[in-house]
Regions:
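Hydrophobic helix-coil surface modules that form long, contiguous segments used
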Residues: 174-182, 190-345, 374
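Short, hydrophobic/aromatic-enriched beta-strand segments in well-ordered soluble domains
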Residues: 45-47, 64, 137-151, 200-208, ...
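Solvent-exposed beta-hairpin/edge-strand motifs
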Residues: 62-114, 169, 205-210, 526-539
C-alpha cells in the first residue's frame, strides 16, 4: 500500500464548544486509605455535581465497576456465554474466592448534608436525590465507600502475572454521564467507558515502600520522593500519602508497586514523561529504550493532530495488555521491544481521541479504537518507514467479512455477538474508515479534518456526525452516504472490471458494482510505453471531487456514477493494443473485499 499521508504541520489552538452545546461538570475530592496486604481500601468522596443540562434531575447514578469481578456477575455470565470469550477472562471470574473477588460499595451518602437512600444494582448505584437538581445548579454529594481489589483478570487488579501489585483503574465510585440522550447507565461487562468531564483532587495513603504513578500532577513530591524529587523529607510511620490533582479529565487511574523503577524524561513539547516499570533485569533495557521513542511519538502526534494539552504523560507497567486512561496508560511490560513500542504508541494515540475528544466509547468504540489505530499507523509510516502500517487493518476486515461475522459499527460495544466482530470492527474497520476516507476526499483533507475536529471538539463529547460535518467542510464533499454505509450497515465494497473491448482508436471499459456500497473509482491505466494515467469517476452522492493524486499528471475526471446503477461504461482515448494494465484503486486504500476482479492484464 502506498503512503499517501503527507502531514501539513501547523499549530492548533483548542476552541470552545459551539453555542447551544452543554455538558455536565463534576469535581471529585477523594481521600483513600489502602491496605496493601488485604487489598482492601476505604475512602471518602466529596463530589460537586453541576447540572448544565436544561433538565431537572431527580436522581443520579454511579458506576461501581469492581462489582463485576464476582461469580455470576453480568461480566462473568457474558464471558462464559459468548462463543469466543476473551482468553484473559474466560471462566476465571466464576472461580474467584471470597478474598479474591472485587467489590465497591457505598456505605453512606449525603446530598448537601442530607442523608440519602440508595440501591446497588451490581455495577450501578441508583441514588434518588433529596432535592432535585435544577438546571444551572450544583450540589455536593458526600460518600463513604469501601472496596476490595480483585485478583487481576481484566485491566484492574492485584498481583498481575508480571508481579505488579496494584493496577487501579475504574476503582472509585464514578458518576455516570448525563447528556442530551439522557443517562448512560450501562452495566459493566468488560468493554468500554464514558465519563463526565471534571477535576480530581485525590489523596492515596498506603505503605511507604510503594511507588505510585498515574493520572494527575503530584502535589507533594518532597514528601514522597520515589523519583518525584531528588531529596525526600523524612517521615514517621509506615505509610505515605500521595496527593494528586488532575484538572479537566474524565477519569482517574493509578498503579503502585514496591519494586517500581521511576524514570522521567522532558519531551521537546514541554511535557514530562514518566515511566514506571518493575526492577526486572530482563526488561530494563527495553524500558530505557522506550523513553526517547515515546518522546518522538508525542512530538509526531502533536504535529499531526494538535497539541497534547497536559504537561505530563505516564507509562506504567501493569494491567493485562494495554489500556488508555487520563494522562497515562497501563501496559504489560515483559514484551519484545517492537511489541512494547507498538502498544505504547497505540495507547498514547488514544490521548487525542479517547481522552481529549472523549467519544462515548460504548456507542462509538470504532472512533475510540479505530482513530487511535490510524494515528499509530501514521506514526509507523513517518517515524519508522513502515509503508505497510495500514495493511493489517484491511486484512483483518476482509477476513471478518469472509467469515460472515461482521456486525455494523453502530452496534453497542456490549452487544456484539462475538468478540471477533467487536475487535475487528472497533480497531480495524474503524481505522479503515479514516484511511479509506483518504481515497474518497484525499489524504491532505483527512489530516485537515482531524486537526479541525480536534480543535473544535476538544474537551467535549463529539459524535460520528460531528466528524462527518467537519470532513465535509474540509473537503467540500458530501459524506452522509459514506458514514451511513460504512458504519450503519454491513454493505461491502466490491467492484469488477467486467469487460475491456477494443473500439478502434478507443478502449471501452465496463465496470460493475457487485457489492452494496457505492464508492468513487480511481481507474489506473498503465500504458505499454510506461506512461500512467488515472480516470477518476466520482460517486454522484459526493457532489464534489477530490484533488488529483500526488505524482499523477494525467488525471481525467469522468462523468459521475449514480450509486443505484450497477454498470458504468468508460471510453479511454487509446486503442487497447497500447494499454498494458487497468487497475481499480492503484493506491490500495479502498477496502474492496475481492481484489481478484480489480485488475485487467492485457496479454496480447
Amino acid at each position: 500500500m502506498k503512503a499517501l499521508f503527507f502531514l501539513l504541520f501547523c499549530t492548533v489552538v483548542l476552541a470552545q464548544p459551539k453555542p447551544g452545546y452543554w455538558q455536565q461538570h463534576v469535581s471529585y475530592t477523594m481521600d483513600v486509605a489502602i491496605d496493601v496486604k488485604a487489598f482492601r481500601y476505604t475512602g471518602t468522596q466529596d463530589l460537586i455535581y453541576t447540572n448544565k443540562s436544561p433538565d431537572t434531575l431527580k436522581r443520579v447514578f454511579y458506576h461501581l465497576y469492581f462489582n463485576a469481578f464476582q461469580p455470576n456477575s453480568e461480566m462473568d455470565v457474558r464471558s462464559r456465554s459468548i462463543v469466543d470469550p476473551d482468553v484473559r477472562v474466560g471462566a476465571r471470574i466464576e472461580k474467584l474466592s471470597t478474598d479474591e473477588i472485587g467489590y465497591l460499595n457505598a456505605t453512606t451518602l449525603h446530598q448537601d448534608g442530607v442523608s440519602l437512600s440508595f440501591q446497588e444494582e451490581e455495577t450501578l448505584l441508583v441514588v434518588p436525590l433529596a432535592t432535585p437538581l435544577v438546571p444551572g445548579a450544583s450540589t455536593t454529594l458526600t460518600m463513604r465507600f469501601e472496596g476490595q481489589v480483585p485478583k487481576q483478570i481484566r485491566r484492574s487488579g492485584r498481583n498481575s502475572e508480571e508481579g505488579v501489585a496494584l493496577s487501579m483503574t475504574q476503582w472509585y465510585p464514578k458518576l455516570a454521564e448525563y447528556d442530551h440522550e439522557g443517562w448512560h447507565t450501562n452495566p459493566y461487562i468488560g468493554r468500554e467507558f464514558h465519563g463526565v468531564w471534571g477535576d480530581f483532587d485525590v489523596k492515596l495513603t498506603l505503605d511507604k515502600r510503594y511507588v505510585v504513578g498515574g493520572t494527575g500532577y503530584l502535589q507533594n513530591p518532597a514528601e514522597v520522593g520515589h523519583g518525584y524529587a531528588e531529596k525526600m523529607k523524612k517521615t514517621k510511620g509506615k505509610t505515605l500519602t500521595w496527593h494528586f490533582v488532575a484538572p479537566n479529565v474524565h477519569d482517574f487511574a493509578w498503579a503502585a508497586d514496591p519494586d517500581y523503577i521511576h524514570d522521567t524524561l522532558e519531551a521537546d513539547s514541554g511535557v514530562t514523561l514518566h515511566f514506571f516499570y518493575k526492577n526486572n533485569p530482563k526488561i530494563i533495557e527495553n524500558w530505557k529504550r522506550l523513553q526517547p521513542d515515546t518522546a518522538k511519538l508525542l512530538s509526531f502526534f502533536n504535529n499531526a493532530i494538535g497539541p497534547y494539552p497536559y504537561k505530563q504523560y505516564t507509562v506504567l507497567q501493569g494491567g493485562d495488555g494495554g489500556m488508555e486512561y487520563a494522562m497515562c496508560t497501563l501496559i504489560t511490560g515483559e514484551r519484545t521491544y517492537p511489541s512494547l513500542y507498538g502498544v505504547t504508541s497505540h495507547e498514547l494515540a488514544h490521548s487525542w481521541f479517547q481522552h481529549v475528544l472523549a467519544f462515548n466509547e460504548s456507542k462509538y468504540a470504532w472512533m475510540d479504537e479505530g482513530f487511535a489505530v490510524f494515528l499509530d499507523a501514521l506514526g509507523e509510516q513517518s517515524l519508522n518507514g513502515n509503508m505497510a502500517a495500514f495493511a493489517p487493518a484491511y486484512e483483518d476486515y476482509r477476513q471478518v467479512v469472509a467469515d460472515g461475522l461482521e456486525e455494523p459499527l453502530t452496534t453497542h460495544a456490549d452487544r456484539f455477538d462475538t468478540n471477533t466482530a467487536y475487535r475487528t470492527g472497533s480497531y480495524d474497520k474503524g481505522a479503515v474508515f479514516l484511511s479509506q476516507l483518504a481515497y474518497v476526499i484525499g489524504p491532505e483533507a483527512v489530516i485537515k479534518s482531524l486537526r479541525l475536529f480536534y480543535k473544535e471538539f476538544a474537551f467535549t463529547h463529539p459524535t460520528p456526525n460531528d466528524f462527518k460535518r467537519i470532513a465535509e467542510k474540509a473537503s467540500g464533499i458530501q459524506l452522509e452516504w459514506y458514514l451511513n454505509d460504512w458504519t450503519r450497515t454491513t454493505n461491502v465494497i466490491d467492484y469488477n472490471i467486467k469487460s475491456v473491448t477494443n473500439k478502434g482508436a478507443q478502449t471501452e471499459v465496463v465496470l460493475e458494482r457487485v457489492g452494496g456500497m457505492g464508492m468513487p473509482i480511481d481507474l489506473g491505466v498503465l500504458y505499454k510505453n510506461g506512461e500512467q494515467a488515472v480516470h477518476y469517476i466520482p460517486l454522484q452522492m459526493m457532489f464534489g471531487e477530490k484533488p488529483p493524486l500526488a505524482g499523477i499528471s494525467n488525471w481525467a475526471v469522468e462523468e459521475d456514477w449514480a450509486w443505484a446503477r450497477p454498470i458504468y461504461t468508460l471510453l479511454i482515448d487509446a486503442p487497447l493494443e497500447e494499454i498494458s494494465q487497468l487497475r481499480i484503486d492503484p493506491t490500495g486504500l479502498m477496502a474492496d473485499i475481492d481484489l481478484s476482479n480489480n485488475v485487467f492484464e492485457n496479454t496480447k
